[in-house]
Amino acid sequence: MKLKLILLGSLSPLIGLLIFFLQLQVPFHGIKYLVILAIMSAVFLAYFFFCAFFFSSKQHKKNSLYFFVTPFILFLVNFIGWIQKYVVLALIVSGVSAPFHYVLPDLIFPGDKYYLIMSIFPLVICWIAFKIGERVGIYFKERI
């Protein structure tokens, strides 16, 4: 179970990058553009929710730790300066943040002193979606 959670967590930056590249294909026009971006971000958060939902149990309290090993390591690697010089490599490393790039514009390449807060914000949002899925999964498994 731990290995499955680590592998599913390792897929999340790749899925985030895929959603980011899909967002680049959306024409930049009006409310339809914003709705499509919101739907794509919601689909990305649904991935975290359903992974937690299907792996939730009262015995395994550390599911989120195993699931977020790879995204957190990539978050730390993102602070290496030379990675930011190469846009594609920086996007791969910040894959969990990528779907939120158009929602929060200064997220991937900010230049201010609050870089850490803005960079960890998407990871926190994904963690909250994971925890909600875990709680809902435990609730439904108790009812059955």
Locations of regions flagged by a protein language model:
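Hydrophobic alpha-helical transmembrane segments
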Residues: V103-C126
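Transmembrane alpha-helical segments in integral membrane proteins
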Residues: A46-A52, M118-E142
